Amino acid sequence: NIEPLPIEQKLKESIFINQVMVVGQDKKTLGALIVPDFEKLEDYTRETGIEYASRDGLLEHPTVKNLYRTELKSLISPKNGFRTVEYIPTFRLLSKEFEIGMELTQTLKIRRNVITEVYGEHIASMYR
């Protein structure tokens, strides 16, 4: 069994990740729902010359997806004490932050059951 909390805590060390929830503990591979740090991500797009029409367009941009893929690989690695089964090969970038009273408790803990329900289609798409 894989404990998601240490993985999520490590991923939040990235300047580009604001919120994250690991999914797929019952699947062959893990996945992640990631809420980017949009301020840092927009700084990155200015520096690299990425053009986009909307926030959703930004999140689908191949360069942005590669940035997050690289972040996941470097953070969840054996050099950081993670096992290969804890690597996250698939993820979805979300355009909306998790909110207190909805996806988060008053103490900012993730409500996994709520997020799984709200983002069920995103999660399912990672395993098709």
Regions found by a protein language model. Name each.
Residues 1-86, 100:
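AMP-binding/adenylate-forming catalytic core of the ANL superfamily
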Residues 19, 69, 73-128:
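Conserved C-terminal "lid"/linker of ANL adenylate-forming enzymes
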